[in-house]
């Protein structure tokens, strides 16, 4: 089996985890108690969904997941909520005091008290796996636990599970809707620390999701529940190929192989289509060609940046539902003829396709319409550098005045870590710039100085 363990860190990670597991249960017909009436072979290990659920002797399905937060309120909602019977109590780990939006508290002071317990739980989950494929880690960049504890966890997972893939789903701080003043600090510190430990990180920008909810789903004031349900659809599309049998299945390592040309350039842009409310879906034609071209609209992206200003290095199209390869090929051929979509000259083919026959499921009472087919596009584009540049600029404004730095130093960090992290991100921006240069431009630049 190719099992995946999901780790949900901090408030954002835990709440997205809630939405994801609710959706997985609906997709697989698993009840909130963990029973699965449709599963005839009790204890059968060969079902595809066993990558995400382990099965007990009594036929109960338990998510292969750990929820961690340094303060209890958010995880308590799971302990008392509809799905409280689904999880083993030991999978829900909470501390007593939170990280207070402070990376240093999450990574050093408070985080290190809990890390061994968390790793112990992860160890127990991995012992139940026959062929652990890797970890999916959900967290935000802006919070103290999401940034600090995640980076500590990633470092330790690299030590304990060396070669196993680690994929992140990271909530990028929204440019307008900030929940903390120090988000730029936390984001840059966590990115610097996890950069070498993460194999692939899918960024989700809260503001982009707000705009999609307002524009496509006509929700005037989107709540976190609305955002998380949308994010869970995207996560479900990315993981569908691991949980169902499909025509063209894609596993975790395959994502990396096809999306990450250089180890540091591992931040694919996620786009999902169709995002549409029930009343609109009734009147629109959503064939493969339409949903495919919708993926190249910046408005449907999960991070605010403009790929028309950058170049694509690789593109992964994950279709689900009623889709045949012939339609996909036609749709992609059309896309390739458009001038606005540019690939780097060293990567001419650029498209990887996955098809899964399981149509998208929607949460009853949710905002999304039930559709016959959907596509999730993961593209590695140089335009993502815009998002880093925005964050770096905010970091610089605060750091020039050393604002708020004493809170971090007081928790045992050194000021040098700030400048080190900032330099690393400057290098990351430069990496993106160089990757986007055409081959001959790059050679001209290098050719000037003889060594």
UniProtKB/Swiss-Prot annotation:
GTP binds at residues 11, 71, 140, 144-145, 179, 206, 228. The keyword Aminoacyl-tRNA synthetase does not apply. It catalyses: GTP + H2O = GDP + phosphate + H(+). This is Tubulin alpha chain. Keywords: Acetylation, Cytoplasm, Cytoskeleton, GTP-binding, Hydrolase, Magnesium, Metal-binding, Microtubule, Nucleotide-binding. InterPro entries: Alpha_tubulin (IPR002452), Tub_FtsZ_C (IPR008280), Tubulin (IPR000217), Tubulin/FtsZ-like_C (IPR037103), Tubulin/FtsZ_2-layer-sand-dom (IPR018316), Tubulin/FtsZ_GTPase_sf (IPR036525), Tubulin_C (IPR023123), Tubulin_CS (IPR017975). Actively expressed in the lens but does not seem to be lens-specific. Tubulin is the major constituent of microtubules, a cylinder consisting of laterally associated linear protofilaments composed of alpha- and beta-tubulin heterodimers. Microtubules grow by the addition of GTP-tubulin dimers to the microtubule end, where a stabilizing cap forms. Below the cap, tubulin dimers are in GDP-bound state, owing to GTPase activity of alpha-tubulin. One of its GO terms (cellular component) is cytoplasm. It comes from Enteroctopus dofleini (North Pacific giant octopus). PANTHER family: TUBULIN.
């Amino acid at each position: 089996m190719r099992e995946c363990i999901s780790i949900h860190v901090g408030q954002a990670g835990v709440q997205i985890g809630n939405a994801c597991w609710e959706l997985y249960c609906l997709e697989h017909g698993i009840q909130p108690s963990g029973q699965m009436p449709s599963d005839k072979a009790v204890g059968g290990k060969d079902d595809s969904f066993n990558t995400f659920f382990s099965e007990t002797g009594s036929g109960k399905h338990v998510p292969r997941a750990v929820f961690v937060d340094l303060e209890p309120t958010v995880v308590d909602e799971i302990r008392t909520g509809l799905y409280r019977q689904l999880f083993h109590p030991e999978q829900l780990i909470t501390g007593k005091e939170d990280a207070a939006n402070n990376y240093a508290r999450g990574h050093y002071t408070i985080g290190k008290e809990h890390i061994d317990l968390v790793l112990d739980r992860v160890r127990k989950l991995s012992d139940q796996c026959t062929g652990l494929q890797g970890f999916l880690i959900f967290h935000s960049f802006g919070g103290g636990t999401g940034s600090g504890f995640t980076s500590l966890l990633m470092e330790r997972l690299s030590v304990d599970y060396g070669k196993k893939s680690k994929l992140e789903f990271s909530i990028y701080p929204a440019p307008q809707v900030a929940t903390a003043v120090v988000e730029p600090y936390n984001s840059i510190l966590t990115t610097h620390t996890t950069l070498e430990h993460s194999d692939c990180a899918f960024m989700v920008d809260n503001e982009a999701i707000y705009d999609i909810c307002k524009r496509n789903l006509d929700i005037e004031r989107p709540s976190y529940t609305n955002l998380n349900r949308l994010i869970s659809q995207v996560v479900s599309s990315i993981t569908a190929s691991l949980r169902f049998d499909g025509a063209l299945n894609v596993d975790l390592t395959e994502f990396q192989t096809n999306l990450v040309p250089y180890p540091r350039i591992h931040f694919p842009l996620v786009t999902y289509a169709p995002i549409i409310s029930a009343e609109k879906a009734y009147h629109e034609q959503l064939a493969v060609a339409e949903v495919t071209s919708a993926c190249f609209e910046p408005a449907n992206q999960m991070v605010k940046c403009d790929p028309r200003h950058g170049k694509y290095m690789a593109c992964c199209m994950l279709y689900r539902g009623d889709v045949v390869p012939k339609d996909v090929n036609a749709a992609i051929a059309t896309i390739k003829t458009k001038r606005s979509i540019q690939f780097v000259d060293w990567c001419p083919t650029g498209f990887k396709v996955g098809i899964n026959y399981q149509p998208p499921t929607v949460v009853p009472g949710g905002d999304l319409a039930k559709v016959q087919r959907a596509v999730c596009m993961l593209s590695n584009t140089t335009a993502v550098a815009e998002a880093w540049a925005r964050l770096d600029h905010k970091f610089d404004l605060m750091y020039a005045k050393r604002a708020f730095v004493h809170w971090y130093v007081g928790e045992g960090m050194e000021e040098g870590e700030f400048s080190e992290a900032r330099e690393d991100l400057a290098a990351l921006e430069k990496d993106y710039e160089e990757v986007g240069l055409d081959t001959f431009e790059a050679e001209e630049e290098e050719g000037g100085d003889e060594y």
